[in-house]
């Protein structure tokens, strides 16, 4: 048996063992979680390399997202996007979404508007592969632990909105939250909307719990609903707090509705 044949059968054996191990709940969870992380790294790196000839552009996201969706297809996670036409508005707006887990990166790829940048926590600039794509997609990093740096980020993002008519994707909870109740919203997204005098577009994802649960070591195939709600006119609210509270309330109520629907979809 020559070296090539041995290598081929060795690879087949490893794949077979991994497939068998993946059927064990806990081991399967870690295999799928590692696979998803690799998809993020490789998808971001390949998407980044493919985007170099085009230079820095917010629309490089679509190249990376297509690669990422293709790579994660074997995981069996499906997203149903509703009211997508709201995203097609050419004017700038802030899109806010609830943030549950790392799977939100895959979810956002199905609801991404043209000429949009994302505000990311600063630690992600060190995530291999992903950071290259984020750089070429003109993503914005925000330091949540430094008010001074956070304010500078908000100011630079405001300039992007005004000068390039950008849309900005923000997770107002500020961190992952797998609970049924949305966390208290941070003010950054709403300050931006008020200062730029642009609307807010709420984006609500149904719960991931039917296919992903960190505590239970569960990561399987499943279905998630993404619903784009009508835009909220920021100019109709006197204060940032009023705007933030209103947006959180409508998103929370809609989240309950979507979770009930998702329960039936994931039977």
Give the ranges of each region predicted by the language model.
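Membrane-anchoring hydrophobic helices of lipid-metabolizing enzymes
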Residues: 8-93
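Catalytic core of membrane glycerolipid acyltransferases/transacylases, capturing the structured
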Residues: 40-63, 74-75, 89-147
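Hydrophobic structural segments
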Residues: 3-7
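Short amphipathic alpha-helical segments and helix-helix/interface helices
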Residues: 68-69, 108, 131, 158, ...
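Short acidic-hydrophobic, aromatic-tinged amphipathic segments that line or gate anion-handling sites
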Residues: 81, 140-143, 234
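Generic preference for hydrophobic
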Residues: 81, 95, 118-119, 226-228
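Non-catalytic C-terminal accessory region of glycerolipid acyltransferases
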Residues: 8-11, 151-267
């Amino acid at each position: 048996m020559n070296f090539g044949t041995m290598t081929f059968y060795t690879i087949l054996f490893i794949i077979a063992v991994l497939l068998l191990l993946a059927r064990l709940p806990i081991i399967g969870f870690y295999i799928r979680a590692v696979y998803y992380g690799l998809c993020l790294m490789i998808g971001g790196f390949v998407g980044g390399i493919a985007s170099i000839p085009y230079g820095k552009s917010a629309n490089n996201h679509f190249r990376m997202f297509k690669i990422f969706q293709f790579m994660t297809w074997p995981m069996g996670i499906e997203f149903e996007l509703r009211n997508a036409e709201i995203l097609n508005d050419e004017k700038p707006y802030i899109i806010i979404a609830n943030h549950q887990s790392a799977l939100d990166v895959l979810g956002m790829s199905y609801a991404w508007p043209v000429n949009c940048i994302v505000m990311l926590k600063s630690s992600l600039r060190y995530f291999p592969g992903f950071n290259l794509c984020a750089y070429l997609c003109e993503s914005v990093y925000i330091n949540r632990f430094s008010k001074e740096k956070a304010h500078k980020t908000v100011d630079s993002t405001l300039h992007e909105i005004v000068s390039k008519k950008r849309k900005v994707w923000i997770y107002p909870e500020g961190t992952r939250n797998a609970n049924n109740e949305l966390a208290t919203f941070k003010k950054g997204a709403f300050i931006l909307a008020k200062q730029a005098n642009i609307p807010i577009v709420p984006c609500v994802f149904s719960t991931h719990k039917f296919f992903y649960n960190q505590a239970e070591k569960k990561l399987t195939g499943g279905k998630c609903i993404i619903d784009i709600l009508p835009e909220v006119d920021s100019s109709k609210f006197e204060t940032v707090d009023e705007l933030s509270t209103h947006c959180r309330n409508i998103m929370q109520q809609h989240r309950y509705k979507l979770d009930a629907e998702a329960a039936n979809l994931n039977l």
